[in-house]
Amino acid sequence: EKETAYQAIYSAIHDVREIIPEAIFLQAEPDLVGMSDLADLIGCTRQNIRKLLTNDSSSPSPCYSYAFSLWHLADILFWLQESKSYAIDQSLLEVSEVNMKLNISVHQLKTDKNTSTDRAIKDLAKFAVFNQLSIR
C-alpha cells in the first residue's frame, strides 16, 4: 500500500519528536521556492521560468516579492500541470501541497491568540479572498 505524502511527513515529524523531544519545528520543505529552485526542480532554465511566470497573467502570484520573489511550490506545480500541461511528479506535487498547508497552519497556530483582532483579521482574509465578510 502506497504511503501518502501526509503519512510520510507525519511519520518524519513523529520520528524526530521521538529522538529529539525538544526539537522546534520551523518549516517543512519544499514549500517556498525562488526561480532558481523552480528551474532545478522542474528541469529547465531560470530564464524559462522567468518567461513562464512573467508572460502569463494566470501564473500564481509570489507570496513574497521585494529584492527577489518566492512562491509556494505547490501553487506553481499545480499551475504548470493544469495550465501549461507540464508532466509533474505527483509525489512532489503532493508533498509540496502538504508542506504548504502545514507551514501555513503552524504559522497561524504560533501567531493566533484568538483575540477579537485575530477574529477580525480572519474575516478580513475571507473578504479579501472570497469577498465574504461577517461583521462582528
Model-assigned labels for residue ranges:
Residues 1-16:
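Short, intrinsically disordered low-complexity segments
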Residues 14-30:
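Conserved short beta-strand edge segments in small beta-sheet-based binding/regulatory domains
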Residues 43-70:
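Major-groove DNA-recognition helix of helix-turn-helix-type DNA-binding domains
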Residues 27-51:
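Polyanion-binding surface elements
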Residues 73:
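Conserved G1/Walker A P-loop phosphate-binding module
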